[in-house]
Structure formats: C-alpha cells, structure tokens
UniProtKB/Swiss-Prot annotation:
SUPFAM superfamilies: Metallo-dependent hydrolases. It comes from Escherichia coli (strain K12). Signal peptide: none annotated. One of its GO terms (molecular function) is N-acetylgalactosamine-6-phosphate deacetylase activity. It catalyses: N-acetyl-D-galactosamine 6-phosphate + H2O = D-galactosamine 6-phosphate + acetate. Gene3D superfamilies: Metal-dependent hydrolases (3.20.20.140). This is Putative N-acetylgalactosamine-6-phosphate deacetylase. Keywords: Carbohydrate metabolism, Hydrolase. Belongs to the metallo-dependent hydrolases superfamily. NagA family.
Length: 167
C-alpha cells in the first residue's frame, strides 16, 4: 500500500488503511521518504510497527534531476521549487526523490541503520514481488546488479548484471 498518500489518515477510532498497513503482517508499506509526502514522525511510526515490511519508493516524475521550474504531469502544469513539485492548488504532484536520497533520509530522519534502509530499497521490494530468490541481495546464484554507496550513502558505482554501468 502507498502508505499515508491517497488514503484516509490514521485516527484512533478509525485506523483506516494506514492502521491496517501498520498492523497487518501481510501488508507491504510503500513509503516516499522525502520528508514532504510523509512527515519524519510518521516515517518513524512505520519503522516502529513494520520495519521489515517497508519498501522505499520515489514517486518520481519527469522533473526529477531537473532544476526548479514549471513542468507538466498528466497534462497539468506543476511547479517545482526546492525539489518539491506542487499543483496550482498546492497539492503534491509526484516527487523528485532518488532512491539513494530515500535511503539517506530514512537513516537521517528515522534513525534506522544504513543496512536497514538499504534493505528497504533492495531486499524488501524483491520480497514484496516474490523475486527475492534472484534479486534483492548478493548471494551465489542471484543476479549481480549492485549499487556501490560511499559512507554518506551516495551512489559511487553501478553494476547491472555484473557489468559496470556509466551514470
């Protein structure tokens, strides 16, 4: 589930979809960890309740990696300022988040370990899709697609199926 976004919020008398996602062990929580779509305290709540079921996603749109300015999303003009994309009425319109930034944000904003945040971006999505036998971690017999991060969790190198890629 696309946790917190596009659904009823968590309320103590009506926990709704968020409450179900936090408590139902069958649910995977897709989380846009940019600090705009989901408040850091709400991200931390997900970690307390469902750390092993969080899947980091970006919800990135065409302005990702681009300078601030006007863009279109599904035919509607949107404005990006400071990396945050909004509609004319002020609503969020996708994100400009990268996966490595989501990993850094989880570590910085929620206190999870780098290994836990990396699993949220690699092993957990593979488990959610049922392909963790071939993807999501480095083990003999699995596909060797690897992202090398520095100590600050910034991308340094990428290998796709064992081949060094340029980026």
């Amino acid at each position: 589930m696309h946790c917190y976004n596009g659904m009823t919020g968590l309320h103590h008398r009506e926990p709704g979809m968020v409450g179900a996602g936090l408590t139902d062990k069958r649910a995977w929580l897709e989380l846009i960890a940019d600090g705009h779509h989901v408040h850091p305290a709400a991200m931390s709540l997900c970690c307390c309740c469902a750390k092993e079921r969080i899947v980091l996603i970006t919800d990135a749109m065409q302005a990702a990696g681009m300078p601030d300015g006007r863009y279109t999303l599904c035919g509607e003009e949107v404005q990006m300022h400071g990396g945050v994309v909004r509609t004319a009425s002020g609503g969020l319109a996708g994100s400009t988040l990268s996966v490595d930034a989501a990993v850094r944000n989880m570590v910085e904003l929620t206190g999870v370990t780098p290994a836990e945040a990396i699993h949220m971006a690699s092993l957990h999505p593979a488990r959610m899709l049922g392909v963790d036998g071939v993807l999501g971690s480095l083990k003999p017999g699995k596909r060797a697609s690897v992202v090398a991060l520095d100590s600050g969790l910034h991308v340094q190198q990428i290998w796709i199926q064992g081949q060094l890629a340029s980026f």
